[in-house]
Structures are given as structure tokens and as C-alpha cells.
């Protein structure tokens, strides 16, 4: 895929820039204990990640991808989860190898970088700050920043508008079906990372890279 026309790059957060499963799983299991439920294996919680904290709380309570918890139970769980997770955002969350260097290389190409995540903005921004990633991004759009989140095209189109570029000039880099679907809906290039939470071969992206440095090489060489 030729990337010469790309003028900006958007990145997902969880599973793309950072591995946050340890802290998400700890918060989810602390919430389950608070609600009188037994703990879940972190791999189960990993399978529930990707649609924001509200959905994760439903799934962590029910242990079902498409089920919703009873309203009052969800509210208790949500309040507990957010407080617990906010207090332990980066205890065990790690930046994937090569991410910092890769972001620096892309910025050296004078490409604006934005973050588009389904994690709420009030959690995504401090997490990026604590991990030393915030300064790489000119804009961070969380799952609650706009009326719609991925897989909606809205977050991507919003970034295009802010940056003054056309949708086809934005590349969306992520690890999930939501990232690819949002890119498709917006008319942006869809790039998957091969190391994320999902099997990249199942996502139907335009391109799969195994590091951000690999993406830099492709963009530098057109």
C-alpha cells in the first residue's frame, strides 16, 4: 500500500501503544470482589476490552461479551471500577517496545499524530501523561469526547476537521475490529498492528505492521 498521500496518523491506545491489561484486569477483579463475585482470569478480561470502560464493566460483571448487567449493579460496579482504575492507571501498564522511538520517527517526518481511543478522555489523557506519551500527540479523542466513538467514523472525521485534512489523508493505526471499521466508515487508511490484543489477520486492514518503526519506513519510502 502506498502511503505517500498520508498527512497525519491516528493511533488507538490500548493494545496499540500500551498493554494495559494488567491494570484493567486488577481493577475489574477488585470490582468483582466488591460486588461479591469471584475473580476472572485476566485473559477473559482481555477479551472484553475494546469498547470503553462502560462496556467493560458490563462484560466484567456478566462475563459475557454481549450481555448487560442489572442497572443498579452496573452503577455500583462502574463507580468502583473508575475510582480504582484511576488510582492505579499505570501500576503495571507498559508501553510496547519501540513505540516511543517509532512515534518520534513519525514526528520527524512532520506528521501530526493524534490518539483516538474508546477509553474515556479523563482516563486516556492522564495515562498518556504518566507513561510519557502525551507530548507526541497534538490531539487526544476519548470515547466520551464526542457523541459517538469507534466504530463510528465521527472521531476520525473530527480529527480530520481539526487538522484541516481530507479523510483519505489520515491513517488509522489500531489492533481491533473497531479501529478498522471506523477507518472504513470514515474513508481513511486502516493499518493494523501485529502485536495487539486481536489477531491482525482477521481484521481486514489495508496493511499490517509489526512496529511503528516499520510504519515509519513505509511512510518515509512512500
From Swiss-Prot:
Its EC number is 3.1.3.18. One of its GO terms (molecular function) is metal ion binding. It is an enzyme of class 3 (hydrolase). Pathway: Organic acid metabolism; glycolate biosynthesis; glycolate from 2-phosphoglycolate: step 1/1. InterPro entries: HAD-like_hydrolase_sf, HAD-like_sf, HAD-SF_hydro_IA, HAD_2, HAD_sf, PGP-like_dom2, PGPase_prok. CDD domains: HAD_PGPase. Keywords: Carbohydrate metabolism, Hydrolase, Magnesium, Metal-binding. It catalyses: 2-phosphoglycolate + H2O = glycolate + phosphate. The keyword S-adenosyl-L-methionine does not apply. Its cofactor is Mg(2+). GO terms for cellular component: cytosol. It comes from the Bacteria. The active site is at residue 12. One of its GO terms (biological process) is glycolate biosynthetic process. Mg(2+) binds at residues 12, 14, 175. Belongs to the HAD-like hydrolase superfamily. CbbY/CbbZ/Gph/YieH family. Specifically catalyzes the dephosphorylation of 2-phosphoglycolate. Is involved in the dissimilation of the intracellular 2-phosphoglycolate formed during the DNA repair of 3'-phosphoglycolate ends, a major class of DNA lesions induced by oxidative stress. This is Phosphoglycolate phosphatase.
Amino acid at each position: 500500500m502506498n502511503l505517500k498521500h498520508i498527512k497525519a496518523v491516528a493511533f488507538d491506545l490500548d493494545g496499540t501503544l500500551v498493554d494495559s491489561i494488567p491494570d484493567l484486569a486488577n481493577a475489574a477483579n477488585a470490582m468483582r470482589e466488591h460486588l461479591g463475585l469471584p475473580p476472572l482470569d485476566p485473559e477473559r478480561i482481555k477479551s472484553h476490552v475494546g469498547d470503553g470502560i462502560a462496556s467493560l464493566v458490563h462484560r466484567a460483571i456478566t462475563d459475557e461479551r454481549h450481555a448487560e448487567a442489572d442497572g443498579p449493579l452496573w452503577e455500583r460496579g462502574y463507580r468502583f471500577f473508575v475510582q480504582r482504575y484511576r488510582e492505579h492507571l499505570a501500576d503495571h501498564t507498559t508501553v510496547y517496545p519501540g513505540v516511543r522511538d517509532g512515534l518520534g520517527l513519525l514526528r520527524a517526518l512532520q506528521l501530526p499524530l493524534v490518539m483516538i481511543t474508546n477509553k474515556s478522555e479523563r482516563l486516556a489523557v492522564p495515562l498518556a501523561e504518566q507513561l510519557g506519551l502525551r507530548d507526541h500527540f497534538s490531539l487526544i479523542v476519548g470515547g466520551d469526547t464526542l457523541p459517538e466513538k469507534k466504530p463510528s467514523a465521527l472521531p476520525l472525521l473530527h480529527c480530520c476537521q481539526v487538522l484541516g485534512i481530507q479523510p483519505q489523508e489520515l491513517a488509522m493505526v489500531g489492533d481491533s475490529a473497531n479501529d478498522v471499521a471506523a477507518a472504513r466508515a470514515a474513508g481513511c487508511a486502516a493499518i493494523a498492528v501485529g502485536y495487539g490484543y486481536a489477531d491482525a489477520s482477521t481484521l481486514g486492514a489495508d496493511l499490517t505492521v509489526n512496529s511503528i518503526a516499520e510504519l515509519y519506513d513505509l511512510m518515509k519510502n512512500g
